[in-house]
Regions:
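Short conserved micro-motifs at the rims of enzyme active sites and ligand-binding pockets
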Residues: 25-26, 100-102, 125-131
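Aromatic/acidic polysaccharide-binding cleft in carbohydrate-active enzymes
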Residues: 1-74, 81-84
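Beta-strand-rich recognition/accessory modules
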Residues: 147-168
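Generic beta-strand/beta-sheet core signal
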Residues: 15-16, 28, 89-91, 119
Length: 168
């Protein structure tokens, strides 16, 4: 989200570790599996194309130890004019509370929701492993709707969300 938000200055993003240790793809002698960090990069690569819109977020905040108040909701919106698609990337960082989110997208009033992808697990230390490679994976299961350009969505606590819109 941060790299997209600063796309006017950040022209390329690289992953330092592509395989093993802290990588989005882990391997062993017998197989390979995707870590949870793989999916946000996959979504950004697939759906984060176009113009990053100036996304104004009003959210409850928490106190970060060395950085003062930080919003629970982190969000960026990308408009792909060529494909007539809009994608919302959002993270609810609240560890306990789900968040009802309202977005004013009246400039896209003739768009409909294509899908709401969510990735969530109650256990923050849960991970995908060789034995359980799909423990945490994105699912098209989010709860969102759009009416006259006003989008409402329920974002689970500790969740990554991708809401895709397309012109009717």
């Amino acid at each position: 989200i941060t790299m997209l938000r600063h796309a006017d200055r950040v022209k390329i993003g690289c992953l330092a570790q592509l395989v093993n240790v802290i990588a989005p793809i882990m391997t062993s002698d017998t197989g390979a599996w995707k870590q949870t960090t793989y999916y946000p990069f996959q979504h950004a690569s697939a759906f984060g194309r176009g113009t990053v819109l100036n996304t104004i977020v009003k959210s409850p905040v928490y106190t970060a130890k060395d950085h003062g108040d930080a919003p629970y909701l982190d969000c960026v919106v990308v408009n792909n004019e060529e494909k007539e698609e809009v994608t919302i990337f959002a993270v609810n960082k609240d560890l306990e509370e789900d968040m009802d989110v309202t977005m004013d997208l009246r400039q896209f009033a003739d768009y409909k929701i294509v899908e709401h992808i969510i990735m969530h697990d109650d256990d923050l230390k849960a991970e995908n492993t060789e034995a359980d490679p799909y423990r945490i994976k994105p699912e098209v299961a989010g709860k969102s709707q759009i009416d006259n350009g006003i989008l409402t969505a329920l974002m689970q606590n500790k969740s990554w969300n991708v809401i895709r819109l397309a012109k009717n």
